Amino acid sequence: MSRSISIGGIPVGDGCPVFIIAEIGINHNGDLSLAKKLIDIAVGAGCNAVKFQKRTPEACVPAEERNKIRETPWGRINYLEYRKRLEFNEQDYGEISDYCQKQNIIWFASSWDVESVSFLD
C-alpha cells in the first residue's frame, strides 16, 4: 500500500520526489522586501515551499523577559517590542501569498500559540 498525501497539488510520500521546504522563519526581520528575496532564493534553489513562523509576542514572551533591553536591527529596544517588529500582519501575509503564487511556490507558516492558529486559519 502506497502512502502519500498532496501538498499544494504536489504528491508527497512513498515513491514521490523529495518535497523541499525552505525555512524562512523570522529571518526576514519583519521586512517584506527581505522576505521576498528569501522566497526568490528558495525558488532558485528548487524548493517546493517556504515556511514562515507566526507568533503572538504577548503570548510567547515570558513576562520577566519583556522589558529587558536587547541589541536589535532597530537599535536597543525591549524584547517584547523586538518580537512585535518581527511579526507580519494580515496584509503582509496577503502580499506574501500573492508573491508566492506568482513565483509558483507553496507557502505556509507554523503557529506558536493559539491566537496565531486563529490568525492563520
Name each model feature, range by range.
Residues 73-121:
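Active-site beta->alpha loop and helix N-cap motifs at the rims of alpha/beta catalytic domains
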Residues 20-24, 50-52, 107-110:
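Hydrophobic faces of well-ordered beta-strands that scaffold small-molecule active sites
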Residues 25-27, 53-57, 112-114:
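Active-site beta-loop-alpha junctions enriched in small/polar residues
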Residues 23, 42, 120:
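Conserved, mostly hydrophobic/aromatic
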Residues 1-21:
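N-terminal amphipathic alpha-helix/helix-capping segment at the start of soluble metabolic enzymes
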Residues 27-45, 90-91:
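Glycine-rich anion/phosphate-binding loops
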